[in-house]
Design a protein with these regions (language model features):
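Positively charged n-region of N-terminal signal peptides that target proteins for export
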Residues: 1-5
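Short, well-ordered loop/turn sites that connect or cap secondary structure elements
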Residues: 188-196, 200
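Mixed-charge, low-complexity intrinsically disordered regions
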Residues: 22-167, 174-177, 266-569
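A recognition module on extended beta-rich or small alphabeta surfaces enriched in W/G with H and D/E
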Residues: 148-182, 226-273
Length: 569
């Protein structure tokens, strides 16, 4: 591997000004099937750039993993849907958390295909910060590593990437290209630009990779967690927008090329260095996701004033994204939406069950409760990062809230006769209740109590317990699942101190906003007093069914029972 420091970096325009086509779309033939990776496990570069076909192949690789339903990074790369699995010995173990996963998958694919690869291995904060992962003004790239032929083994590369990358690596202003270019750029919100392989960065410290975009514009993603589990979900308001310096949102891999290398007779490129395309040489670079579709404000501080519109109609950002990815058309099939959201929430409950079971298996619940919470319960290190679930739980609660809010939105659209609603029935509310009940009835999640007995919760029971489920890894499994009935809770071995912590953490459980900038290293006594960073007293409404029951019988205004839109065949 070749290290590049900021002071030594020089961009060679010849790569992009040469007679060859731009590296983002060079019409280079690619052989069928996996490319050879060279002798042994060494990284061997056989192609000097990524072509459009390579990018499509990478997207197909990501889609296959996303659709495979693998549950750990190791399972994904050893699984039958990885076309390169036969080249990896059975004893090789793959790991990744959320920030590492996009890089691990990209580096792995580049290695197996013989493609050039380079990565930012050092970022520094722009201004003072307590934690570089949550800097107010973002970070800048100060050092890069080029991966050249025969420099590392592919497995060594994956380890090096995991050591170098954190969520801080994504927290970069879309305009910033100094001291060094970042690996990623901000793409236009277009169907051709947001695709499998595109990364989504949540500035609250989470990263996901898109594996599918449906015809109606709905985005499906995969993500990983500190326990190396892999989960799936739909893009929604859990991925928040924020000031441009934080670099939130969609990111694509910057076009790269190998320059100055010697091509041997066997086709292997030796030496050289990797160069990255600057923003102004990337056809679909755009900052609209930060500033809106109108004129960019002079000051980044005014970013939130930027609005989004399509075909003359003002839109919410998330609607805008969906409409653009659906061919500039925004439509909702409310029955399908509710069905999919209940199903997704059920999957998230199962993912949580796996995470809690993994924590319990380590015995951490038998350790004494520390005297203080971590400096921040959402962004920390060590056992708390691996085995606690405050971030996961907050995202789960947000998803339940979004289902409730979407249900109300669909009802209001139905009542108003909104043509964006694709519904061919005669009683939307009843159909939504029926769909909700059917999907909820099929959802069961089971946990193992301290004495080895099993408790199974239905979807509605889990929803009722949602804000009582402990995120604290030092609590018994019964409290992790909000057991309240004396018979269910009887096997919990938590003493008075842990019981007091559970009670004191209630307001933190009520909070769905992940406040990574808050100081939260409270003692038990401090947590019990009012003050910032201690949560909220009342949780949000997440009961979609109760809302739907409250509006039963509602009909569209000025209509009898005419469908609001023609259903698709």
């Amino acid at each position: 591997m070749r290290e590049v420091r900021a002071a030594a970096f020089v961009f060679f325009w010849a790569l992009f000004a040469s007679a060859a086509a731009p590296i983002a779309s060079a019409p280079q033939a690619v052989p069928e099937g996996p490319r050879p990776s060279g002798a042994g496990n060494l990284y061997v570069v056989r192609y000097d750039r990524w072509t459009a076909q390579d990018e499509r192949g990478f997207g197909e690789f990501i889609t296959a993993i996303g659709e495979s339903q693998c549950h750990t990074v190791n399972d994904c790369l050893h699984g039958g849907d990885n076309p390169f699995r036969a080249s990896d010995p059975p004893g090789v173990h793959f790991e990744s958390d959320c920030a590492d996963l996009p890089y691990v998958l990209r580096a792995y694919y580049a290695w197996k295909r013989g493609l050039p690869f380079s990565y930012e291995h050092d970022v520094e904060p722009r201004g003072h910060t307590r934690d570089i992962r949550y800097t107010k003004n973002g970070n800048e790239v100060t050092a890069r590593t080029d991966v050249l032929s025969f420099s590392p083994s592919g497995y060594t590369l994956l380890d090096a990437v995991r050591d170098a990358i954190s969520s801080a690596s994504y927290r970069i202003h879309p305009d910033l290209q100094e001291p060094l270019e970042p690996d990623l750029y901000s793409p236009a919100i277009e169907a051709k630009s947001i695709h499998p392989g595109t990364i989504i960065y949540d500035p609250n410290g989470h990263v996901a990779t898109i594996y599918r975009v449906d015809p109606d514009g709905r985005i499906s993603y995969i993500d990983a967690h500190p326990d190396n589990s892999v989960t799936r979900g739909f893009y929604d308001e859990r991925f928040v927008r924020s000031r441009p310096g934080m670099g939130a949102g969609f990111k694509n891999w910057r076009p790269i090329g190998l320059v100055g290398a010697t091509r041997r007779a066997d086709g292997v490129y030796v030496g050289g260095h990797v160069e990255l395309a600057p923003n102004d040489r990337i056809a679909d670079y755009s900052d609209e996701q930060f500033f809106g579709t109108g004129k960019r404000p002079r000051d980044d501080g005014d970013w939130a004033r930027g609005g989004f519109s399509l075909n003359g109609e003002a839109m919410d950002y998330y609607d805008f994204v969906r409409a653009k990815l659906a061919g500039d058309k925004l439509e909702f099939d409310p029955v399908k939406e509710v069905r999919d959201m209940v199903d997704s929430n059920c999957n998230d409950l199962h993912y949580r069950a796996d995470a809690v079971a993994l924590a319990i298996a380590t015995g951490i619940q038998n350790q004494p409760e520390p005297e203080r919470l971590p400096p921040n319960i959402y962004g920390t290190e060590g056992d708390w990062e691996i085995y606690s679930t405050p971030s996961r739980d907050a995202r789960l609660k947000t998803a339940f809230k979004e289902l409730r809010d979407k249900a109300e939105r669909f009802v209001r659209m139905y009542e108003a006769g909104d043509p964006k609603l694709v519904y061919a029935g005669h009683d939307l509310v009843s159909d939504l209740i029926g769909t909700y009940d059917r999907e909820a009835a099929d959802c069961r999640v089971t946990y193992v109590r301290t004495n080895g007995s099993h408790v199974t919760l239905g979807y509605e029971e889990a929803r009722l317990r949602l804000f009582d489920m402990s995120f604290d890894p030092y609590h018994c499994v019964e409290r992790r699942w909000a057991a309240a009935d004396p018979s269910e809770l009887s096997t919990c071995r938590d003493g008075p101190t842990k019981q007091a912590w559970y009670a004191a953490e209630r307001n933190l459980r009520n909070q769905i906003d992940r406040t990574y900038d808050a100081e939260m290293d409270f003692t038990l006594a401090e947590l019990g007093t009012p003050g910032p960073g201690k949560g909220v007293a009342v949780p949000p409404d997440v009961d979609a069914r109760r809302y739907l029951m409250s509006v039963r019988g509602l009909r569209p205004k000025n209509q009898r029972h005419v469908p609001l839109a023609t259903a698709r065949p």
